[in-house]
Amino acid sequence: MIYYGTGSEKTTLTEEDLRNGLYTALDKIGRKKKVLVVPPDITRIHSRAGEITKLAYDYYKKNLTDILPALGTHVPMTDDETAKMFPGIPLNLFRVHNWRNEVVTLGIIGEDFISEITEGKIKYPWPAQVNRLIKNGGHDLVLSVGQVVPHEVTGMANYTKNILVGTGGSEGINKSHYIGAVYGMERLLGKADNPVRQLLNFAASKYLNDIPVVYVLTVIGRDESGKLVTRGLFIGDTSEVFMLASDLSLKVNFTVLEKPIRKAVVYLDPDEFKSTWLGNKSIYRTRMAMADNGELIVIAPGLKEFGEDREID
């Protein structure tokens, strides 16, 4: 069901618009006694998820008991980073996703299905994994909040990825990323339907049905002055809400050029990009526009590590 949806290439949603849209949806969903919010981490600080999480906290008050940022294998946020992205929310509500030790396997997707969606290139089973708080926390509502934007692994970010990858375990994360790599980034970037998304949506249909997840999806673009603005807000619990957000993202987050780029300079926001693991997005998101033998210059003042984890690093 779609509880709320608005947006276009010219829409500019204010914080008041976000509040009205979110509260319209939450009113339709009905009263809840124990709510979990799953937003992104600070690597998605521009998603408006911080503000939306605060609005949800204001709406549910003491009934919002837990906030679990979808870290994936990213390094946990510091208290300062949490306060910056989620101002006005008590720090004691935040939980840290431990992708090594705090995941449960909901079920296994068989190797035949993986082989089918990957054109026979990969044949291994895939575990549908989530943080145990999602499965065993006893929440009567899980709000999955985040931005739909072109993504180098899943074609379009968010929706079922936020739960099954963002709160998943190492095996599920690594194997899903490898499927995207084998299929080919150029074939899936910006496409809502692709093998990785088929896997995540199929797993969700089999193993998330007993978990009351509602997705709150934003689409962010730039106005004529280059300022980031919110172009869309879509809230619901079916794939249709994701497709609406993806269609809008395709219009506002892609720039089609008349000819390839000979030389490009990419600046990485130091608050968002601190590792080469994330900084490599400067390559992923330009490579399809770069000319053969072109030059890409990456300015990364916040860079301090390779991996998003001390052991991986």
Which ranges hold each PLM region?
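N-terminal amphipathic/basic leader segments beginning at the initiator methionine
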Residues: 1-17
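Glycine-rich phosphate/diphosphate-binding loops that line cofactor/substrate pockets in enzymes
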Residues: 20-36, 61, 135-138, 209, ...
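Short glycine-rich or small-residue beta-strand-to-loop segments that form or flank ligand, phosphate
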Residues: 34-45, 68-72, 144, 265-267
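Histidine-anchored nucleotide/phosphate-binding helix
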Residues: 44-63, 279-290, 297
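Short internal beta-strands
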Residues: 63-74, 295-301
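Acidic, Ser/Thr-rich peripheral helices and adjacent loops at domain boundaries
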Residues: 81-101, 307-313
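Conserved, well-structured core segments that form the ligand-binding/active-site neighborhood
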Residues: 96, 100-260, 288
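C-terminal catalytic subdomain
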Residues: 274-313
